[in-house]
Amino acid sequence: DVSIRMNVQTSIALRPADPGAARIELLSGEAAFATAGRSFGVRAADRWILANRAQFDVRYISAGGERPVCVTCLNGELQVERGAELIAMKEGQQLRYDARGESLAAADIEIASAWQRGFLLFRFTPLADVVDEINRYRPGHIFIVNAEIARLPVSGRFRIDRMDEILTQIQQAFDARVRLLPGGIVLLS
């Protein structure tokens, strides 16, 4: 048994698998997977994430022209195939990989899974990264036109169904200027 929860702007494809197994490719976006007693694989970029009894999140989103993959093991154990090698992951670990390599570290499960509860959670995250994430959830686009403000750290919990309230909060917290243009375009300086 497998359950899949897809975040906004997510595309997946079903892939052929052995009998009794399931295989999905995450083409782009973010999805949470849970499997109980069934062999299950998710392909993201050039690797397979393999699970039997686990809950995990896979994120494959363009960031600054790059497309890194981030795998977070929320519960159970995972294996990530890298050629003939397997990288073992356990609950509370996060693997980031791209064409240049990978890094395995402790995960902040609360941040990684916040979207599943209807929130975005940030801890000392540069405003530029916060805006990239906000842009996934609202129509239009926010542009930061001041490089200095882009580096400012943001911490907070924001409701996904109230994305435009974040602009007011950013404006107040950083004394930033917000210019609203037609089509949902926002200039932040």
Where are these regions (language model features)?
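A residue-level detector for the "anchor" residue at the start of short, highly conserved motifs
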Residues: 2-189
